[in-house]
């Protein structure tokens, strides 16, 4: 099976990296193989080593964020999305990744009925998606759905006026 092929490739890639610790391709392939075999921690570590070799590669920062997101580590997913958005503010990919992290966090932790915190996180996701799309981002986005359901989901004037003074 394909998983077996990935499992067989991992020790070979590790040996390659021992021989040439600057091999971007070997780190990328190790990360992909680790992800395919569901070893998300090893995948994240391989991507992080790749990022050390090429610390300006926004795609690698986003890949690291995605692996942490897949592993439900929202703190590290957001940290790497932040790093991605700080690398290049001309493209919206990093901002889109931040929107994605906030959206998945909201989707995973929201309560019924929504709390103000839930609404704030949904609003952050929406705002980052919109900022990203204005910069040409075309990746994962729930901005249209969030906008369509904003009265029910997003933090807005109704919640602001209902908030206690100490919150404002």
Language model features with spans:
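Short coil/turn linking the two alpha-helices of tandem helical-hairpin repeats
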Residues: 3, 69-72, 99, 104-117, ...
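Canonical positions in the second alpha-helix
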Residues: 16, 49-50, 83-84, 132
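Residue-level recognition of tetratricopeptide repeat
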Residues: 23, 56-57, 90-91, 136-140
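TPR alpha-solenoid repeat register
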Residues: 26, 43, 60, 94, ...
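Terminal, low-structured helical/coil segments at or just beyond the last alpha-helical repeat
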Residues: 126, 131-168
